[in-house]
A protein has these predicted regions:
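Histidine/acidic residue-rich metal-binding segments in metalloenzymes
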Residues: 2-101, 111-135
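His/Asp/Glu-enriched, well-ordered alpha-helical/loop segment
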Residues: 126-181
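Extended low-complexity acidic/polar segments
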Residues: 90-112, 154-175
Length: 181
């Protein structure tokens, strides 16, 4: 673990696997992460496992508008799962929050409906999203579900080497190496 970070996570939002926390519960959790960070001299973050549900990050934006918790305490993951979620994550990063792109959910690996990781990085760079608020992780060998047309769910594995491949492709797409890394 990183000694400069204290936090809570991953809390699932907008996902069929979520326990569907209420906005008040999320306000309390975010405040606890923030206060824990303040008391310990660490970041105090709330990491969010994001699904592709229709609400996306809307609850987080409501919390930011209704409380004194700064955006920097929120880190949604899997934000390239669908285009709408990626757009919301870019807005969160512009407001001072962070966003984590998943390299392990690529079309070539059987995932559909998402934004290719290298494409998400390129979009962020070209649209002026603060790149020091954008991270990418592989979700290393994590199980990822892909809904099927018949209502079943196919399980796939996020491959570790996808991180290197996607960073390489982002550079080939025009993102400067020092920005991509």
């Amino acid at each position: 673990l990183i000694d400069k970070v204290l936090g809570i996570g991953e809390v699932a939002l907008s996902d069929h696997r979520s326990s569907q926390p209420t906005k008040d519960e999320m306000k309390r959790i975010a405040t606890q992460a923030r206060l824990g960070g303040m008391l310990s001299g660490k970041a105090g973050v709330l990491q969010l496992h994001m699904g592709s549900g229709k609400s996306g990050l809307s609850m987080i934006f409501e919390i930011l508008d209704e409380t004194e918790v700064p955006a920097r305490h929120f880190i949604p993951t899997h934000v390239n799962r669908c285009p709408k979620l990626l757009r919301q994550a870019k807005e969160l990063a512009r407001r001072g929050g962070y966003m984590d792109i998943t390299s392990g959910g690529r079309l070539c690996d059987g995932f559909t409906g998402g934004v290719e990781p290298h494409e998400a990085i390129r979009q962020c760079y070209e649209e002026g999203v603060p790149m020091d608020h954008v991270t990418m992780s592989s979700d290393g060998n994590g199980g990822m579900s892909v809904p099927q047309p018949d209502g079943t769910v196919k399980l796939l594995t996020a491959r570790l080497h996808s991180l290197h491949e996607e960073l390489r492709q982002a550079v080939l797409d025009g993102v400067p190496l020092e920005v991509a890394v």
